[in-house]
Swiss-Prot record:
<dbReference type="GO" id="GO:0034599">
    <property type="term" value="P:cellular response to oxidative stress"/>
</dbReference>
<dbReference type="GO" id="GO:0005737">
    <property type="term" value="C:cytoplasm"/>
</dbReference>
<comment type="function">
    <text>Has an important function as a repair enzyme for proteins that have been inactivated by oxidation. Catalyzes the reversible oxidation-reduction of methionine sulfoxide in proteins to methionine.</text>
</comment>
<comment type="similarity">
    <text>Belongs to the MsrA Met sulfoxide reductase family.</text>
</comment>
<dbReference type="Pfam" id="PF01625">
    <property type="entry name" value="PMSR"/>
</dbReference>
<dbReference type="InterPro" id="IPR050162">
    <property type="entry name" value="MsrA_MetSO_reductase"/>
</dbReference>
<dbReference type="InterPro" id="IPR002569">
    <property type="entry name" value="Met_Sox_Rdtase_MsrA_dom"/>
</dbReference>
<feature type="active site">
    <location>
        <position position="10"/>
    </location>
</feature>
<dbReference type="GO" id="GO:0036211">
    <property type="term" value="P:protein modification process"/>
</dbReference>
<keyword id="KW-0560">Oxidoreductase</keyword>
<dbReference type="GO" id="GO:0036456">
    <property type="term" value="F:L-methionine-(S)-S-oxide reductase activity"/>
</dbReference>
<dbReference type="GO" id="GO:0008113">
    <property type="term" value="F:peptide-methionine (S)-S-oxide reductase activity"/>
</dbReference>
<protein>
    <recommendedName>
        <fullName>Peptide methionine sulfoxide reductase MsrA</fullName>
        <ecNumber>1.8.4.11</ecNumber>
    </recommendedName>
</protein>
<dbReference type="InterPro" id="IPR036509">
    <property type="entry name" value="Met_Sox_Rdtase_MsrA_sf"/>
</dbReference>
Length: 162
């Protein structure tokens, strides 16, 4: 089982989206790559902790290649927007790909270079090793499953199983 962490705006929609992809085994939302210990949602929203709202993904690499997972990620973010996705603004809403396995970096960078060809503006998505990850509060986990009419910056048609 492999792991990758994606930040792409509000983590509710990011988690719901990746749960529709065959080969994704587990997801959880939380706070990635910040500079305090055990932050709360309220802490992260102050814009002072350095954390990104993120989705931690475990996937079966025999069934789902990292390239396909990253391609899916690019479909639901605007990687040229700094600290913003949809109506959400702030450093916690930045885009980021945080890797656990150093060997994944080459695949991530190749995908970013390919994606850059679609844009005139530079891609500002962070690509960094995962420094730390803290689980978000329980009410955030699988939020859109519990609240189907909840806010989501990702189009609803992309949240159907595929």
């Amino acid at each position: 089982m492999k792991k990758i962490i994606f930040a792409g705006g509000c983590f509710w929609g990011v988690e719901a989206y990746f749960n529709t992809i065959d080969g994704v085994l587990n997801t959880k939302v939380g706070y990635a790559n910040g500079n305090t210990e055990d932050p709360t949602y309220e802490d992260v929203c102050t814009d002072s902790t350095g954390y990104a709202e993120a989705c931690y993904i475990e996937y079966d690499e025999k069934q789902l290649k990292l390239e396909k997972l990253i391609d899916a990620y690019w479909k639901v973010v605007d990687p040229t927007l700094k600290n913003r996705q949809g109506h959400d603004e702030g450093t916690q809403y930045r885009t980021g790909i945080y890797y656990v396995d150093e060997e994944d970096l080459k695949v991530i960078l190749e995908s970013k270079d390919k994606e850059q060809e679609k844009y005139d503006a530079p891609i500002v998505t962070e690509i960094l090793p995962l420094k730390n990850f803290y689980d978000a509060e329980e009410y955030h986990q699988k939020y859109l499953d519990k609240n189907p009419n909840g806010y989501c910056h990702i189009p609803k048609e992309l949240l159907k199983k595929h």
